[in-house]
Amino acid sequence: MKTLNDLFEETLKDIYYAEKAIVKALPKMAKKASSEELASAFTTHVEETQGQIERLEEIFGILGKPARGKKCPAIEGLIEEASEIMKEAEDDTVRDAGMLSAAQAVEHYEISRYGTLKAWAEKLELDDVASLLDETLEEEKATDLKLTDLAESEINLAADNDDEEEEAPKPKRVAAKKKK
């Protein structure tokens, strides 16, 4: 890569790969979710992500480039983390909290990438491309806010209540540790 344009195109390939990987992972997460609201959020985001993939394909077309991805180790790591949570969490509500956290990590990655791509598109005077990237950026921010609201209003509370129920017989040991 020698120019900002080269870097822009490589990063575009990265996020294209990421979106394609996300659209495959979300249905698995929806299936594992015990919360109907969380499952619905994941399912809704699949549809939104498919629209974002189409928007990226439109951007590649504007640039006169083929729409193709470039392996993205960052998204693979985030998806692997979600997979581990789905396998290892023994409690449904804890699994939901972990999957929601993993989904937000993905959202934050996407927000970072789309924000950077938009800024570069503006610098490169690719106004149509910047507008399309901004549309996706705003969708990602909105999804992150929805996930935060869901975490704070339901998912984390349910997981925390399960912890309290399991740990209720142990308050004397906790108090003894504090005195030391």
What name fits each language-model region?
Residues 1-180:
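Amphipathic alpha-helical hairpins
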